[in-house]
């Protein structure tokens, strides 16, 4: 069975790739450039991960309209990337409004063309930034949208294997599957050394600490988030 990976190049999409490959799917990978600060580094990670897993069928999409819409510190350079507060329950400024719905729509279009029946996305609801389009209920609803909005003979399902996992469990799963974490990129701010203090870096560093593992990428600073 053919499956599409929505592969950002981050640690969650990397581990999702490892899971899908282990499950025996014929993989095609999609990456979306949307004007984010770390666009080139994420694209490099996407290509490295695809090469590692010998994924030949790839689609790189330019969706810079999300940057033009704005509203996120990932795409609007006038908005600072905030320092992580892992105790906060507020949705951070890094949230890109309704981004995942747009990504999924493009993936469904491609799936119809190439005959893929599954779309894998590394969304995480537990132990995450709290983005509304990373909730299980959102993906359940989107699967209904796919059912209603595609041809009767089309059967495409969005799969979220990490949705209920803690971040440290994702790290452990990646280690178990020999996922190349050194190829992945999570920082919202930098393309050279990861900053270590943005929300995404903090969640990643805490996850590796809780898993008892050393994160292989370079950081400007490595705060300890184990008590956060």
Curated annotation (Swiss-Prot):
Enzyme nomenclature, EC number: 6.3.4.20
Cofactor: Zn(2+)
Domain of life of the organism encoding this protein: Bacteria
Record has Ubl conjugation as a keyword: no
Catalyses which reaction(s): 7-carboxy-7-deazaguanine + NH4(+) + ATP = 7-cyano-7-deazaguanine + ADP + phosphate + H2O + H(+)
Binding site for Zn(2+): 187, 195, 198, 201
Cofactor: record remark: Binds 1 zinc ion per subunit.
The keyword 4Fe-4S appears for this protein: no
First-level EC class: ligase
Membrane-crossing residue ranges in chain numbering: none
Residues noted as binding ATP in the record, renumbered to the chain: 7-17
Keywords from the UniProt entry: ATP-binding, Ligase, Metal-binding, Nucleotide-binding, Queuosine biosynthesis, Zinc
SUPFAM superfamilies, A to Z: Adenine nucleotide alpha hydrolases-like
Name recorded for this polypeptide: 7-cyano-7-deazaguanine synthase
Gene giving rise to this polypeptide: queC
């Amino acid at each position: 069975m053919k499956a599409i990976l929505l592969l950002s190049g981050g640690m969650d999409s990397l581990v999702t790739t490892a899971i899908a490959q282990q499950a025996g799917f014929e993989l095609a990978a999609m990456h979306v450039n949307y004007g984010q600060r770390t666009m080139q580094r994420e694209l490099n990670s996407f290509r490295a991960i695809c090469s590692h897993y010998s994924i030949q069928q790839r689609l790189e999409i330019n969706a810079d309209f999300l940057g033009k819409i704005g509203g996120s510190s990932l795409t609007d350079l006038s908005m600072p990337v905030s320092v992580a507060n892992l105790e906060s329950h507020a949705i951070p400024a890094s949230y890109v409004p309704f981004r995942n719905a747009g990504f999924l729509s493009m993936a469904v279009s491609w799936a119809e063309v190439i005959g893929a029946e599954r779309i894998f996305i590394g969304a995480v609801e537990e132990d995450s930034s709290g983005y509304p389009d990373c909730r299980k209920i959102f993906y359940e609803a989107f699967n209904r949208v796919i059912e209603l909005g595609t041809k009767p003979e089309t059967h495409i399902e969005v799969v979220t294997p990490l949705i209920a996992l803690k971040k440290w469990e994702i790290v452990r799963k990646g280690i178990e599957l020999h996922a190349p974490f050194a190829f992945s990129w999570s920082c919202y701010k930098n393309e050279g050394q990861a900053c270590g203090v943005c929300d995404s870096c903090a969640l990643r560093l805490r996850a590796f600490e809780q898993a008892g593992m050393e994160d292989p990428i370079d950081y400007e600073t490595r705060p300890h988030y184990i008590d956060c």
